[in-house]
Amino acid sequence: RVLLTSDHGSILCRRPTVVYAQKDASSSLRYKIGRDLRLENPETAFLTKAEEDLRLPSASFATSYALALDDHYFVYQNRLREYQRRYRNSFLHGGISPEEMIVPVVELKPRSE
């Protein structure tokens, strides 16, 4: 008997979305954690300040959480062109799509023992 698994998947990111964040925000392109996060286009990401929305433990300071939706990835306004050139049409980790959250597992058994 053999169990076969792999890392969770990634998603092909095609569309940038501008996020406004302070310098101490996380560096991920598919999610952001930081103080006072704001989005240029709110329909492109899930944004919350409530840890319970994400089933996370309570933070000791005011923290915002942004999770990119669909095939979006976060860029900063002052580095928009650079990030578009570098990351458009690339496979990225870190969002809330099924591809990124589900870990595949298969059990292989011989036909007869």
Residue map of PLM features:
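Feature captures the catalytic ectodomains and active-site-proximal regions of enzymes
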Residues: 1-113
